[in-house]
Amino acid sequence: MTQSFIQNRKKWLIGLSIIVAFFSLAGYRYSKSHAQDDVLTIGISPPYAELLQSVADEVKKQGIQVKLVEFSDWHAPNVAVQNGDIDANFFQQSVFLSNAIRETNYDLHAFATGAGSHVGLYSKKYKSLDSLPTQARVVIPNDPVNSARALILLHRAGLIQLKDLNNELSTVQDIVSNPKQLQFIEVEGPHTAHAFNDADLIFGFPHYLKMAKVTDPHHAFFLTR
């Protein structure tokens, strides 16, 4: 068990404990679908399954059973909460949630935080960002929040320049300078890792890269939260 795993586990434990406390203090009553099992159902992303399962085992000591439901995309967990199929989800940034609510008018509320996810720039074909060719193909997520995170990281790496670095919803239309004429390919966030072997550069999430077994997640040109 690595130090990073232990530190993240503590952060997730705090977050899930807050979820448990929230439902308990609010006088949470299980619906008929939960009546027999007394289970608090929480939606998560696959890369965090092992970590969060260990946390759920700890939360069990507080008297509430936690069932983790894995979702392969980042849209379904919020839909599931909105529809009442699960009790909560635990996978997204506050900016991502705010944008989802703005786009869908879902009645969702944030009440717990956990460990933040690192993101980075990765390439199989090139050893440095300077060696990227003109019109290099760069794979970024297609959701507004993580697409902006990718562009901001590319700006900080000196590959492009954005109109406003503080705009958390920047799009490719906000690029004011692109010296290498980078070509952007947008895919669903969880799938950027699968483009590692073919693209010139990807904006990747270490947990997904590790799960896809395509590269060492620590071998990034830039790695940040």
Label each residue range with its predicted role.
Residues 68-79, 166-194:
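Short helix-initiation/N-cap motifs at beta->coil->alpha
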Residues 99-111, 124-126, 198, 203, ...:
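Ligand-binding "clamshell"
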Residues 1-39:
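Short, low-complexity disordered leader/linker segments with a strong preference
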Residues 39, 45-70, 76:
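Short, polar/charged alpha-helical segment
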Residues 70-74, 84, 88-98, 188-189, ...:
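Beta->alpha turn/N-cap motifs
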Residues 111-161:
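A conserved helix-loop-strand patch within extracytoplasmic ligand-binding domains
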Residues 82, 86-89, 107-113:
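Short beta-strand-centered segments that line the small-molecule binding cleft or hinge
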Residues 27-41, 60, 129-135:
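Immediate post-signal peptide segment of exported/extracytoplasmic ligand-binding proteins
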